[in-house]
């Protein structure tokens, strides 16, 4: 079974993979990083005018990093807006995903947080820099292979 956006993408021969539906009935799609730019624009034109949230996670040690976008179609007079969840998987060694800041401005801080915590580089983001950690921080704290520094050793050194 396909959701409305997935059916539309198939009809227009746009590459994606349906991952089924979550517990709320929201369709989950997988998009390749190189296709995300065009599918994000198409999603906006299709009516997904609100980026509810963007987050990222480390799929597995040594595996892919995922950037997740929850999009909603906000329309007047509609009590149950249509939603879709889009996952973009990037290789761990050089995780690059096109930024959607220019489509949904609310992606600004959310993409910066994903960069700060996992090291995903959002291409064409206007201010991609750390937002939670100091600029001097080394590494990506939410990666499963991250080794936390020993803060007691650092304090004792002073």
Swiss-Prot record:
GO terms for molecular function: NADH dehydrogenase (ubiquinone) activity; quinone binding. It comes from the Eukaryota. HAMAP family: NDH1_NuoC. It comes from Acorus calamus var. americanus. Keywords: Chloroplast, Membrane, NAD, NADP, Plastid, Plastoquinone, Quinone, Thylakoid, Translocase, Transport. GO terms for cellular component: chloroplast thylakoid membrane. It is an enzyme of class 7 (translocase). It is a peripheral membrane protein. Its main location: plastid. Belongs to the complex I 30 kDa subunit family. NDH shuttles electrons from NAD(P)H:plastoquinone, via FMN and iron-sulfur (Fe-S) centers, to quinones in the photosynthetic chain and possibly in a chloroplast respiratory chain. The immediate electron acceptor for the enzyme in this species is believed to be plastoquinone. Couples the redox reaction to proton translocation, and thus conserves the redox energy in a proton gradient. NDH is composed of at least 16 different subunits, 5 of which are encoded in the nucleus. InterPro entries: NADH_DH_suC, NADH_quin_OxRdtase_su_C/D-like, NADH_UbQ_OxRdtase_30kDa_su, NADH_UbQ_OxRdtase_CS. It catalyses: a plastoquinone + NADH + (n+1) H(+)(in) = a plastoquinol + NAD(+) + n H(+)(out); a plastoquinone + NADPH + (n+1) H(+)(in) = a plastoquinol + NADP(+) + n H(+)(out). Its EC number is 7.1.1.-. It is found in: Plastid, Chloroplast thylakoid membrane. The keyword Ubl conjugation does not apply. GO terms for biological process: photosynthesis, light reaction. Disulfide bonds: none annotated. This is NAD(P)H-quinone oxidoreductase subunit J, chloroplastic.
């Amino acid at each position: 079974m396909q959701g409305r956006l997935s059916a539309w993408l198939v009809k227009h021969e746009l590459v994606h993979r349906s991952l089924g539906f979550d517990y709320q009935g929201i369709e989950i799609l997988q998009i390749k990083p190189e296709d995300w730019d065009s599918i994000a624009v198409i999603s906006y034109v299709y009516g997904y005018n609100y980026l509810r949230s963007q987050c990222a996670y480390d799929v597995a040690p040594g595996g892919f990093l995922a950037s997740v976008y929850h999009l909603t179609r906000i329309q007047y007079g509609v009590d149950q807006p249509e939603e879709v969840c889009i996952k973009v998987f990037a290789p761990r060694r050089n995780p690059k995903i096109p930024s959607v800041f220019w489509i949904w401005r609310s992606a600004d801080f959310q993409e910066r947080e994903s960069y700060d915590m996992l090291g995903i580089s959002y291409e064409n983001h206007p201010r991609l820099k750390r937002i939670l950690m100091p600029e001097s921080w080394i590494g990506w704290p939410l990666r499963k292979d991250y080794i936390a520094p020993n803060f007691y050793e650092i304090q004792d050194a002073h």
